């Protein structure tokens, strides 16, 4: 996998993990935005994998859902390994984005 595809995949998996932790905490996007200090618009873009999140913002989100960064990275790593089984829609989204980018 080349670096661009890996970056797209990672952004999508991070977004899915944030969304999953948000749902596990039983809070909505607005509540997570308030708890973390991240705008709702930015949160939507992060959760959908549209942007590469910076470490400071990611840390704010992770702490807001009651996790520590090492725990979060373990979750991300596990999901990267299992993505094909657990996140087929992410795999499709990544494939679609790669196809679109290759047409440009």
Question: What is the predicted role of each segment?
Answer:
Residues 73-104:
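Short, charged recognition helix plus adjacent turn
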Residues 21, 35, 46, 75:
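Residues in the recognition helix of alpha-helical DNA-binding motifs
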Residues 16-33, 60, 88-89, 93-96:
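Short basic helix-loop element that most often maps to the first helix and adjoining turn
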Residues 31, 42, 52, 71:
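Residues in the helix-turn-helix
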Residues 54-71:
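DNA major-groove recognition helix of helix-turn-helix/homeodomain DNA-binding modules
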Residues 1-24:
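A short, Lys/Arg-rich alpha-helix, primarily the initiator
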Residues 36-51:
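Recognition helix of helix-turn-helix/homeodomain-like DNA-binding domains
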């Amino acid at each position: 996998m080349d670096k661009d595809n890996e970056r797209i995949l990672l952004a999508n998996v991070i977004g899915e993990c944030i969304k999953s932790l948000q749902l596990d905490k039983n809070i909505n996007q607005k509540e997570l935005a308030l708890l973390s200090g991240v705008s709702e618009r930015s949160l939507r873009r992060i959760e959908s994998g549209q942007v590469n999140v910076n470490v400071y913002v990611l840390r704010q989100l992770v702490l807001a859902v009651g996790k520590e960064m090492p725990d979060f990275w373990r979750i991300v790593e596990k999901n990267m390994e299992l993505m094909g089984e657990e996140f087929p829609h992410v795999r499709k989204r990544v494939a679609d984005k790669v196809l679109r980018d290759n047409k440009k």
